[in-house]
């Protein structure tokens, strides 16, 4: 049957990508339908019970800066919070939280059910409605046809998914859920390029059977307690729990080696490539044969369960081998396994067939986000979902797509890497992937993206008000620090030495003093009984005050480095944003070799910058392209969220 109501946007899948996509499109005012095979698993954390980490936490902050749900849900569900790399520079500091699975799922579902313009429907999708080269809807497994102007696919690991435990395997999207076989077949029928990847998960353990007394306790950060959302507060956090650390040993490794003849990875049963940066324990033993042990983190799954997630022993070995290897680990000698570990193999679709908006180049109105694009991780999925949802909304409203630049957001780095380089293994975000990471910090994600989000219609009044107060206070106080001067008379030696280590010998601005490595903002403001503090408090909200102080301090201390990086961005920007005509035949560009023109015709980059990052495209080829564009008068430039003729 044809459903009587037509929608603007349909989102297929209710994981981390799908929920952010649906919420974003609905916040933009689009009539949105989220189709999921099971409403009870909306926002399900399919693998580890944690959010964030190096590079990943940056993505979560960016999603939050644009009104997304992941950070706020984590603040409500997080049972341990830590700042990683806290002793290092601000560019690589990252927030990570353990989350209660049940509370996280509840937080996401609450937001979905209360979001205006968004409807939920429980049915798996088997088919897409395509007319010509345009998607017009989706069909569920019982034949209900829903029509829409745009469709966002966020199918995760469900597309033709196959679960492996030892040499046994069966179809499934994850443990306990069916695979999406018909939809995968339909996408292949549409001639969309695809491949096969795999990921895995460890056995889960009953905490009542773990001997924590022989393990190292790992508590969360307490002073201060971190929050994920720019609007989050520590008092939102539920009860906090520690994690625990143990290690594999030589006996563990011998057990694993003895089981490799029944490993689906090492017997050729699994064809898909697994994630390099989250390898299975059998892969670790093989790749790092000289290591005597590997660290294992015992992570609590929640406040109302005894289940623990042993991070570090993801495996698809037969269950009898899993049992033996778990029992060989200190503290787990008597452990009871609640669920066996497994690997899952699934279809992904080549992201090089997508525009920077995550819209298919072949089928108008069809967007892809999450693991279907070859990524791994909740955070990477959520960020893509946000972008796909926004651009589906822009497509429906006939507005230009928003495509963040590499110097603007980790989301820009992520998407640019995917659409220019593709994937040969599941893609994970790291800070090292960003050329301009000093400017792409967790702490300034809102400064980079909230204004853009407001223009796009995804940032509400509460967030916008808090952002403006923060931005104005940072600007006002930074200027005051630059224009307030002290000299040896105003700041005598007896006051200067405790803070600076020596007297000042000439006149300095307060910004000059703050730039010194040993000086922090609060101490500078407390100097001489608060004589140099602002007359009016920066903000009445203590949480916002902390963010404002952090922004001021980083901005002043790293001003020179940030300014140099901004100059580098300006130099690159002209070529980076020069648009390439959609119909350009690269074989007609004089001087381009056959291989280069073939690759460019195959991948159809949207900008000169994207073309430069395609494997095999040389700087000389980019110069030839630039000459060709100028000669033909074809070059156009692209801004951060609009496209216009130069």
UniProtKB/Swiss-Prot annotation:
Its cofactor is FAD. GO terms for molecular function: flavin adenine dinucleotide binding. It holds the Pfam family GIDA. FAD binds at residues 13-18, 125, 180, 371. It is found in: Cytoplasm. Keywords: Cytoplasm, FAD, Flavoprotein, NAD, tRNA processing. GO terms for biological process: tRNA methylation; tRNA wobble uridine modification. NAD(+) binds at residues 274-288. The keyword NAD applies. The keyword NAD applies. It comes from the Bacteria. InterPro entries: FAD/NAD-bd_sf, GIDA_C_N, MnmG, MnmG-rel, MnmG-rel_CS, MnmG_C, MnmG_C_subdom, MnmG_C_subdom_sf. Coiled coil: none annotated. GO terms for cellular component: cytosol. Homodimer. Heterotetramer of two MnmE and two MnmG subunits. NAD-binding protein involved in the addition of a carboxymethylaminomethyl (cmnm) group at the wobble position (U34) of certain tRNAs, forming tRNA-cmnm(5)s(2)U34. Belongs to the MnmG family. NCBIfam families: mnmG_gidA. This is tRNA uridine 5-carboxymethylaminomethyl modification enzyme MnmG. It comes from Cupriavidus pinatubonensis (strain JMP 134 / LMG 1197). The lineage of its organism: Bacteria, Pseudomonadati, Pseudomonadota, Betaproteobacteria, Burkholderiales. The gene is mnmG.
